[in-house]
Amino acid sequence: MAASRSVSITYVPADCGSIIPGKSKAPQAFRDVGIVNKLKDAGVPSIFEHHALEAPATFSATTFSAGGARNEDINIAVCEAVERTIGNNFGATGQPDFQLILGGECCMLPAILSAFWRHANSQSPPQRVGLIYIDADTDLTSPTDPSSIGTFAGMNMAHLVRLPGALPRMEQFSRPSGEPVCDASNTVFFGTNMSLPGNKPEHFKYLFDKNFKVVSSASVAKDPEQRAKETLEFLQDKVDIIMVHLDVDSIDPGTFPLANVPNFTGVEFENMMRALKVLLGSEKVGGLTVAEVNPDHDPGLKMTERLTSHIVEMLAARK
């Protein structure tokens, strides 16, 4: 079932999954630049706002045990609240609204996809959910990796595909069958920085051994629209509903340093927006997550407003 032209916005003010504060301010920054009024002015018929958390879930310095994560309890509580909120959003209307989730952090994604899978499974016939993971990082660090520093956000994809060593408490975010929400049949890595030291050879070995589709940042920079079209074609016959995840560290910080941690991907802001426009133009896309925006890097919120304006234009153009 295609999403309607109405938009449900879910705000997730959290930065408890990393070691740099600031991302918890991003949802309010999107509100401060007028995202709701911009959507109304652009002709989006209905906009609904939802707050997944009663208060921001903020970073605090803490230790962690081997095989675990820093601030594990609060991170899992955030995921539980997000899954509950998105599930309620789906139950509120017959034809689901387009889900726009504004973080916050990438590590809320297992909860989002779990809610999407549960909604998809309730359809007749049951539907399949796909993910386009726009991120410079593979985020495949297992909690049991000897080099792990306990950063929950860096374990994001490890929990999505349920790598060995993934936190047992994250298994609740799954398909209704109990399987992981992501595998090579329904997931595309888009804009991956192949030269980033944090993307280790063993991460790429896992992806290629499992036949994941990986679209490098260099190839996105070269031809954004074509890479986006190829990504949609890859998923076309494999899934019925697509979630797009935009981690803004996929955008090169040379001229757009909005991300929490800079990542020199070579993909300029306008090029990433060209790719995103193609992706959001697909009728199968039912949601967009925006993560890793740090307003502390954006005095005056000019970059946040620029990003917001592009997203609004894309959502307003949806049929």
PLM region descriptions:
Residues 2-319:
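Conserved alpha-helical scaffold segments that buttress catalytic/binding sites
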